[in-house]
Amino acid sequence: MQPIVWLLGGAIALLVVVIRAAWTYGHRNQDMPSGPPTLPFIGNAHLIPKSYTHIQFTAWARQYGGLYMLKVGNSNMAVVTDRRIVKEVLDSKSSLYSHRPHSFVSHELITQGDHLLVMHYGPKWRTFRRLVHQHLMESMVDSQHLPIVNAEAIQLVRDYMLDPEHHMAHPKRFSNSITNSIVFGIRTADRHGSNMNRLYTLMEQWSEIMETGATPPVDIFPWLKRLPEALFGHYVTRARAIGAQMETLYEDILQRVEKRRSGGVHLDTFMDRVIASQDRNQLPRHQLAFIGGVLMEGGSDTSSSLTLAIVQALTLHPEVQRKAHAEIDAVVGHARSPVWDDLARLPYINMIIKEGHRWRPILPLCFPHALGQDDWVDGKFLPKGTMVVVNTWGMHMDPDHRLNQKYDPAKFVPERFAEHPALAPEYVPGAWENRDHYGYGVSRRICPGIHLAERNMFLAIAKLLWAFEFQPGPEGEPCDSDPVTGYQHGFLYCAKPYSTRPVLRSESIRETVEREFALAQREVFSTFTEG
């Protein structure tokens, strides 16, 4: 009998251990930041929405504070919705917080780890970042890239003027053409450009699958990989298809650049410089294709999405347009369009752009960071490997922040930035209390194209407001700016198709547009091939 008793006792003890482990697995430790109640084993995985995640994350921030912890299985996700913590932790301890969490979907199925957005922090990331910075530093942008931006911005106005029906496509062509001209020497002459349309189809799919919660947590529960992917929306098949599209597009464009160079035509583009320095950098073929492709992605989708959001806001706020028109008319007139040198004399345009960043940020949640080693924040423990998500949406919509104390954070009110006359890069290194917005990200992962993007946005919005009054479309055609029903889900945030009617403000403006467009064709566009 005694062996049976021992066996029974051992089985009971093992069962107790298993039950205890299952009960504690998925629960946060007491020294961690608080958060929503957890369930055994799964933690908070059942609570994280598959779309518009930033809305729920912001609701939790109001309940649990500017730093709270979600548990996904036994893994940790810290959500930061506090400007002070962003500055004192992610910015000041950037060497700890600049890592990326490993992702089976993004690293193994789609990018093979060669995409700058998801790339792990290390020598490869530093090489990519150095090459990008050299070509997009502020002095380079002003000396070499600004004429391209100005020329493409006048075509943007002309596109709205001649083809108002397809107004949703024109900002996409504008930003894609600037980026491709600078990166490859290949501009996008019209909205039918094959490279552009391939890219935006790819980006829509990439954005949807990479949104927090959109795929099963296979990095936390590896056994989920063994289950039929049909249970999870065929995520593996979708991810591999996205990766194949990405590789094919980036390789196709790289080959066009190489073919041009082999014919003796060497330009001063980003990829020309990278290829010329291959003896020193020795980038493998996949990385060589991706370094240009990633720049094409980043420059194409962000400026276009923000332009579309601002035009939508202008359509819904004629009082903002009236104030902008008065400022532009007093400074510029109708015989020429606004240029970059007008920035200091057009402060209200700068306010409109900042408010666009705040009101509808292109990345409502910054792409997740990962903690490189254990850390303590405000007396709370964050273990090594914690995924850190910066909730840009929540910070921008915080009713207690001084930018929002006078004006409703849900409303589009450029005047809230009256005390922020400088460009966004000037506020990044300063005091957290005075930062304007987080549209370009944080820490060492901040957008490397920030200087180019600021010029893209100023020239696009200034010229569009100089030329047009944006009126509502025909009755019954919606201009829905609701953050859920009016915007596409995904980690990139873009307005769904909406109605607007760009009304030219004078015939003299039409003449100016045609004259400046003809000049752009002769002096800028003729430099590049088309694609």
Swiss-Prot record:
GO CC terms of this entry: endoplasmic reticulum membrane
EC number: 1.-.-.-
Record's catalysed reaction(s): 3-methylphenol + reduced [NADPH--hemoprotein reductase] + O2 = 3-hydroxybenzyl alcohol + oxidized [NADPH--hemoprotein reductase] + H2O + H(+)
GO molecular function, a single term: iron ion binding
Cofactor: heme
Compartments it resides in: Endoplasmic reticulum membrane
Statement: the UniProt record of this protein carries the keyword Oxidoreductase: yes
Membrane topology: Single-pass membrane protein
Residue stretches spanning the membrane: 3-23
Gene3D superfamilies, A to Z: Cytochrome P450
Record key words, sorted: Endoplasmic reticulum, Heme, Iron, Membrane, Metal-binding, Monooxygenase, Oxidoreductase, Transmembrane, Transmembrane helix
Pathway(s) this gene product operates in, as recorded in its UniProt entry: Secondary metabolite biosynthesis
Residues that coordinate or bind heme: 447
Alphabetized PANTHER family for the sequence: CYTOCHROME P450 MONOOXYGENASE ALNH-RELATED, P450, PUTATIVE (EUROFUNG)-RELATED-RELATED
Function: Cytochrome P450 monooxygenase; part of the gene cluster that mediates the biosynthesis of aculins. The pathway begins with the synthesis of 6-methylsalicylic acid by the polyketide synthase (PKS) acuA via condensation of acetate and malonate units. The 6-methylsalicylic acid decarboxylase acuB then catalyzes the decarboxylation of 6-methylsalicylic acid to yield m-cresol (also known as 3-methylphenol). These first reactions occur in the cytosol.
Family: Belongs to the cytochrome P450 family.
Protein name: Cytochrome P450 monooxygenase acuC
